[in-house]
Amino acid sequence: MSKKTIVSMAVIRRLPRYHRYLEELLKNDVKRISSRELSEKMGVTASQIRQDLNNFGGFGQQGYGYNVEELYNNLTKILGLDKTYNTIIIGAGNLGQAIANYTSFEKSGFNLKGIFDINPRLFGLKIRDVEVMDIETVEDFIARNKIDIGILCIPKDNAQYTADRLVRAGIKAIWNFSPIDLKVPDDVILENVHLSDSLFTVSYRLNEEELFKKLKGETAKIDG
């Protein structure tokens, strides 16, 4: 299980997209936009956008649309991006290092405080001035540095055990890149990220037309 949400996850997953697009509009000095214009750009119906935003009070004006800066600032607060969060990465392999090197997270308030691994040869390695440390010290580090989020980038064999350790140490949320769906207490936030899911979606779309041609042909044979 994971901590329950008040608003549906489908709505929550659309909010970062709205926020990202509004940020681009601000950079292009766009002052206002209608829900219809927003829907055309994002591939979501205008009705869906209004319904999503109404979960948080609604921000548009009849006949005017949305003030881009105001809506962006409101979504920043709704997403909790007006706050800062202390994070650690478990796993200093290629994926862990790639995430550690992604500076945009810090710009959004996610401050990387430590990186942990089981490989002694990696201890002391610095990635953007953040040192790789022994995983056996992680509980003490979490307590001393008030860590909010643990980012798991380790093989699935050790993922659940490591997640349990983080939870016992007081971690509030886990962003899991290990290829396994973890189980955590109801009061812990868990986001499982399976990178292969997106790639498999791409492969499906590449083959979709051919797939349905075959299915249509097989159906025609049966009917004949």
Swiss-Prot record:
Gene Ontology CC annotation, any one: cytoplasm
Annotated localization: Cytoplasm
InterPro entries per the UniProt record, alphabetical: CoA-bd (IPR003781), NAD(P)-bd_dom_sf (IPR036291), Rex_DNA-bd_C_dom (IPR009718), Tscrpt_rep_Rex (IPR022876), WH-like_DNA-bd_sf (IPR036388), WH_DNA-bd_sf (IPR036390)
Pfam family, one: Put_DNA-bind_N
Record keywords: Cytoplasm, DNA-binding, NAD, Repressor, Transcription, Transcription regulation
Residue ranges of the TM segments: none
UniProt-listed GO biological process terms: negative regulation of DNA-templated transcription; response to redox state
Gene3D superfamilies with a match to the protein in the record: NAD(P)-binding Rossmann-like Domain, Winged helix-like DNA-binding domain superfamily/Winged helix DNA-binding domain
DNA-binding region (UniProt annotation): 17-56
Ligand binding (NAD(+)): G91, A92, G93, N94, L95, G96
GO molecular function terms listed in the Swiss-Prot or TrEMBL record: DNA binding; DNA-binding transcription factor activity
Superkingdom: Bacteria
Biological role: Modulates transcription in response to changes in cellular NADH/NAD(+) redox state.
Subunit structure: Homodimer.
Family matches, as NCBIfam families: PRK05472.1-3, PRK05472.1-4, PRK05472.2-2, PRK05472.2-3, PRK05472.2-4, PRK05472.2-5
Family as reported in the entry's similarity comment: Belongs to the transcriptional regulatory Rex family.
Protein name stated in the entry: Redox-sensing transcriptional repressor Rex
Lineage: Bacteria, Bacillati, Bacillota, Clostridia, Thermoanaerobacterales
Gene that encodes the chain: rex
